Amino acid sequence: MDQSQRTVAATPSSSRSYQFHPARAAIIDLFNLYLGRGSRQKPDESLRDPPNKSQKRVHAPNRDLPPRNEQFLLDFELLQSQFNDPEQLRTITESVLISLVVQCSNHAPRAEFLLFALRTLCRISYINWDTFLPSLLSSVSAAEASLSQGVQAAAATAGSSATSSQSVVPVSVNPTSLLPSAHGIGSPSASEVKSVENGQQIARAGQIVRENAMRNSQRIRAAAVNSLRQLSCKIILIGVESSLKPVTHAEIFQYMMNWLVNWDRRDLGTEDSVGKSWRSEKTLAEWLRSCLDVIWLLVEEGESRIPFYELLRSGLQFIENIPDDEALFTLIMEIHRRRDAMAMHMLMLDQHLHCPSFGTHRIVSQITANVPPEAVPHLRHSPITYPSVLGEPLYGEDLAMSIPKGSLDWERAVRCIRHAIRTTPSPDWWKRVLVVAPCYRPSTQAGPIPGAVFTSDMICEAIIDRIVELLKLTNSGNDCFGIDLVSVTFPPLYADANCWQEWLVFSDIFFFLIKSGCTDFVDFIDKLVLRLNGVDNHILRTNHVTWLLAQIIRVELVMTALNSDAKKVETTRKILSFHREDRNSDPNNPQSVLLDFVSSCQNLRIWSLSTTTRAYLNNEQLLKGKQIDEWWRSKGERMMDYMNMDDRSIGMFWVVSYTMAQPACETVINWLSSAGMAELPGLQPNDRVMMTQEVTPLPMSLLSGFSMNLCLKLALQMEEALFVSQVVPSIAMVETYTRLLLISPHSMFRSHFSQLAQRNASLLSKPGVTLLVLEILNYRLLPLYRYQGKSKTLMYDVTKIISALKGKRGDHRIFRLAENLCMNLILSLRDFFSVKREGKGPTEFTETLNRITIMTLAITIKTRGIADPDHMVYLQTMLEQILATSQHTWSEKTMRHFPSLLRETLKGRVDKRGLSIQAWQQAETTVINQCTQLLSPSAEPAYVSTYLSHSFPQHRQYLCAGACLLMQGHAENINSTNLARVLREVSPEEVTANIYTLVDVLLHHVHVDLQQGQSLEAVLDKAGANLAFFFWTHEMLPLDIFLLALIDRDDDPHALIIAMSLLKTPDLLLRIKNYCQNRGSPEHWLVTQVFKRNELQKALGNHLSWKDRYPTFFDDIAARLLPVIPLVLYRLIENNAMEQADNLLLAHSHFLAYHPLRFTFVRDILAYFYGHLPGKLVLRMLKVLDLSKIPFSESFPQYISPTGAPVCPPLDYFASLLLNLVNNVIPPLSSSSNCSSRSGSMADILNSSARPPHGKTPGTSQPGPANASEGQKAFYQIQDPGTYTQLVLETAVIEILSLPVSAAQIVSSLVQIIVNIQSTLIQSGNGFHGAANGVGQGSVLPTSPSGGSTDSMSASRSTCLIPGINTASFVSRSGYTCQQLSCLLIQACGLLLAQLPPDFHVQLYLEAARVTRETWWLKDGKRSQGELDSAVGYALMDPTWAAQDNTSTAIGNIVALLHAFFSNLPQEWLDGTNAIITNLRPVTSVAMLRVVFRIMGPLLPRLASTHTLFNKTLMLLLSALVDVFGKTAQTTAPVEASQIADLIDFLHHIIHYEGQGGAVQTSSKPRPDILALIGRAAETLRPDVQHLLAHLKTNPNSSIYAAAHQQNTAKTNTS
């Protein structure tokens, strides 16, 4: 043996007990005899042999030649007969063989004999390969580790020897020499120089020796590893020919892959230049090729010992240093080819265009996390994901940071952020996606953020893009998008053409982003300077950037950068460089004044920050600050009348807000209290309360220009006056405070309950503070909280108040206001929510709130679906929590419209109404006796206390019912004073119980009276008189709760009649009229008059105002009905009372204008009852909206006209609707502004040809000023739905839902546009001729040779244009090229369809199947399989890429539409997607099969978190596979199974993805039930296809995955 073998110790046996077994010595002797080794030679004996070959020849002992190999079997059988335990002998033999393989691998003759011996023993079935091969590979790994340690030791020895030789270099200084030195003082002698040179030479020699030793060690190890691995591979090739278990195959595969992936790993710690020397040697190729032979044998399709998919997920293709080996390169290329083919099925068409549109307020994350709903508000949100090479959606900050700038993924991420900055989605969205810039993170948070998908660099780039975009708009010389934005917000006198509103909206979010620390401020300034001095050096002409930076100059991070950062001087100089002299034609315009002085404000602030930067300030601007002081002394210090300020004064006051925020704040507060104070009237002297007199609140036009610093100071001081001061604030103060919060929703928002609790925990214990907070929230800030995503949190806070008060006697006002607010909050939620913050136990809601929660769930599920799979799991628990404290049963008419998820749960509940009446009848006698004593006209007032202290609660709940019976329509029959006192002094919970029992008893006695022969009119008149006593005469009960209780008994034929009569009562109508007059405009933020405070008793009635003296601000009995009327409308429609519903809307349409969320309310009713509403009622509902402010299509009214027969609008109408979404909802393709040409990487990819110079102007459904886009509106202008993007999308939804034609007609029109849009747009220059002869015929196959299409195929193709579309204006109104526009219209259509109810989805699936089936080349039986495969490959190309060559196809467009649709669907609605496969079956060709997989494949990763739906979809895909490759399949031409290898790989991959619940890892395994499902389906497949799925079964004897499950189960049981 050579040196390498002598360094290897003998491998220990698998069991130490066999080491001393007598058979072991005999077996070793036998093998040593045939190996030509000395008898019983110890494994390490060879270490003493000298390495010199000549010495070995001289000293070699005389040995006999070994016996012939043919004799071995006889000798072995003879030895075998000497021992009784054959199994033990086999184990020992295997152990010895493994040891000999390790020792003799570098000795070719001995290695050959070992191979011979193994073959011989294999022929007699003596080797158990399933134990032998894993043990062999384990021993090889141990031997390689030992080799590495030995080589490291040798290298260390060589290094130490070289060091020692260097340390003993002699230096001859010869101190005893008598000869004088020949050199001057300090000069070395010749001998010294020579000795130093000798020392350096010796050191270099030592280094060379060390390097040579290292190289020799490397070569020795390489040779040893090569021989050992090569011999092992040869043995494995022998073993694999036997029938091995799947576990053995898997283990062999893992070892082989580990060897290949780590082929160049160096364990010696040497430098790379030293370690490379052995890689290119012949030894590498030998073992590597043997290893490849094993792998090819394992993945051989004929045997399929290991599925080829294991190679795809092995990571072999990612090795950094691919050796120069053709065989390995061939394998890697094959892996890449099959991986790409498989990954395609994971990716949606045009996936790089899929990006959140923010068209809904729902946050839909692209990742799923198994968390309870109560934890959702704290989750990180991943709005996009990055596809891996295997097509899996990935996320994480470490991944995002690896995205190269300028790549498609980078552009997609920045596109998303740009669109968010433009459309200002919920701050809650921003908080969940932002990452703190690394420079601002504490050391404890140094690691990457797992759920993040954006980096600070991406956010910085998007911010700068938006600044550049706004600068270009400002410089355009015309107002934004062709209309005057400012006039929308301000009076005409403040209008300018510089897109001031756009800047205001952006400054709010800019402040929010900078304060969040999501981008490095110093780096941001550097990049902004480079951008404005580089490509865009001509656009900075105004002081808008200086103004923008002045807004944030007091942010802590900014002050740190300007005061203590190392680059503070440079940063300051760059900030000052943005100053430009103002050249506005109107110097008195408020914005012009501000921009003219803002540089001075900035210089003054920087001067006060740091002395080191003062030298760089502009003295002229500093001196200009004196003008500000002079103006302030002359005008500002005295009381200012903010309602009569001229333009210049407004501008100067804005300037003052930047330089003297505190004085400016004080003047505003002084103005709001300038009318003085007065005593609250009607109080006793000892109850004296002071109240601030009313003035006009500050107008929005003035507030909008305040600096953010002043706004924050004002908010704090106002909160002090509102919630801490003992003086009752004025309505003007409250209104101004809410306007501050509405004008800057990102920067100014605060959660009121949390903030007040932090400021002073005792504040909320004061009734006045609690009432004021509840009123502000209920009547002013409800939409703001929804926009912020804080409605659920607020609901939990309010629920705490309700829970604490519902059993407390007397606190009715706070309780009913809190209940009404909670009612509004629940009805405003359009996403799933947990009914308890903790998530466990029954709800703390009242019975009323429980019922409203069920209704809200029904509306949400039916109109928007459940977005998250975890919410679907939690739904049942939530229902149990609600129903645990609610006894209500919903009528059949109501549940008929409920979604099936709710209906199945609720339909089994027992109706306890009969039991309720029985309980009343049992208690009736006692109740009437008590009521007679309490309520007789002559009853003593003192009896009230006796009644309250001695009556039982089960009897008190019938008090109002008993009073009603005693009254008999005559109010004088009862003592109203005593009744009112009892109802005030019992708890709110008991009043609610009285209301519900009153409804039941009232309806019961209506039936009794009718049975006794009384007329219906007389009975209802009596009931009306009784109710008038409670609600109008004495105001004893809350009307809103009674109405809700009444309509919930809608299965009683008289309940809705009584409810409608109450809503039409003159008393109520008068109250509503007075409320509207006192309230003024529904847009309260525009009111510039002095608010009039309503008297407490007039506003709330006797019951709620009782002993309370704290005045109201906005609260009113009429306002409490706003959430109730829509629910009454629901009940009327459910009961088919359409005429009454129309009358209700007619009577209260003006009042409903005050509904805080009326746009959402109209949209949801149209969606909830789609298909059941008559056209007249639809029109009435639309009139509830402020039509002048809704961007409806100009032609929309003519298609919903009640006159004439319903007509489906032309295609031009639908195309324009989609164009409007492209222009206002779909994220733009580049960072360039709406007024400039499109550019950027993604846009370039969409179209490489030259684009026209015209810019993207906001599309309108029809030309005309009435529909012109109004640009970016402030939040307060569109509080419902919240953003302009949402408004445009939801308006399109309302239009579609209002059309008087079927869903099938609408979907057919949309699909017809989409499948032919590209050919229509491109060929529009040639005119339009003819009509569409079927949607599927309009596609064109590519004619390129690589497309595989032939002349005969192209000869019969036809193009189909869409008739009726004015494409000339269509394209010009978009600002995109034809190719770009066609792709974006597909995205817009998918988004729109995903917002519509499931009725439309069913039609879409039918249309998609029809288009696919009608494709002529899929039906052409004359085409070869190769032609069809090529055709389907090109047909399923991304429309983005197909658009470049004008090769868009019907199938490609329809699949892209489905994928855009899928990406916007909530999780629950994905359940219906399986209808596509059902509609396409039976699948009759491989081409059609590929279409099916291409449609549904990308959906499966989203379904991985919904196991049941995943199984269902997978089963249908397998059924389609059986259609083509089943044993009884009737296909036109036989197809080999190898042609669907990519589909087989995809099936392997997706079940691993589902088993892992995410990206596939090395430990990922499929679920056993999935294996069982595929196994059952495989039984019906052809044998050759079955063979490809052999491992996707539950049989551990044939499946490596089933065997792995069995192993894990065994380990678990053992442990």
From Swiss-Prot:
Main localization, broad class: nucleus
Stretches with biased composition (Basic and acidic residues): 41-51
Compartments, as annotated in UniProt: Nucleus
Protein name according to UniProt: Mediator of RNA polymerase II transcription subunit 23
GO cellular component terms, semicolon-separated: mediator complex
Alphabetized UniProt keyword annotations: Nucleus, Transcription, Transcription regulation
Region (Disordered): 40-67, 1230-1270
Organism: Arabidopsis thaliana (Mouse-ear cress)
Subunit description: Component of the Mediator complex.
Function: Component of the Mediator complex, a coactivator involved in the regulated transcription of nearly all RNA polymerase II-dependent genes. Mediator functions as a bridge to convey information from gene-specific regulatory proteins to the basal RNA polymerase II transcription machinery. The Mediator complex, having a compact conformation in its free form, is recruited to promoters by direct interactions with regulatory proteins and serves for the assembly of a functional preinitiation complex with RNA polymerase II and the general transcription factors.
Family according to the record: Belongs to the Mediator complex subunit 23 family.
Chain intervals with Low complexity compositional bias: 1230-1241
Coiled coil: none
